[in-house]
Amino acid sequence: MEEGPGFPFFLPKGMILKNQLIDYWRQIHTAAGYQEISTPIILSRKLWERSGHWDHYKENMYTTIIDDEDFAIKPMNCPGGILVYKNKMHSYKDLPLRMGELGIVHRHELSGALHGLMRVRCFTQDDAHIFMTREQIKDEIKGVVQLIDSVYSTFGFKYHIELSTQPEDSMGAKEDWDIATPVSYT
């Protein structure tokens, strides 16, 4: 609709389908040991700067000012998921800790790139954050691949998985990449 270009409107039948997909998502993630979380749509600019997202994505972020402070509508869920994890102390015995979120995200896509429901400015992102020990990396990767396979097979989707390694403009410590990348290959 021209009143909200790139922002989908879901009519009653579309909502029935969307809710069935959400129910399916909850069922398979619960069975795989995920805890569902929800994080705010608007978070402070300071958080986005601290996470590194501001430097990488600010051109695609919608911003606002609240009480003289800069905020942004989230283009991704990661910083919020990290805040949920950091909300309390965890023992290594709590790990792996799997958190899943169907978070609503907004990205300022160029108007020429918009295409039906395939390329929009607001969408629900199936996101997961797994907190684990180094020794658990391999098993957790296997679990994620099995979960992906289960979902894609259910819907008859064909897929191909490739391993992406550290890009030049990556976020995160090089030491963490150096540990995780070789384990991912095995």
Question: At which residue positions do the language-model features occur?
Answer:
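Short glycine/threonine-rich loop-to-helix capping motif typified by GTGT followed
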Residues: 48-59, 167-182
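Conserved small/polar residues in nucleotide/adenosyl-binding loops
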Residues: 185-186
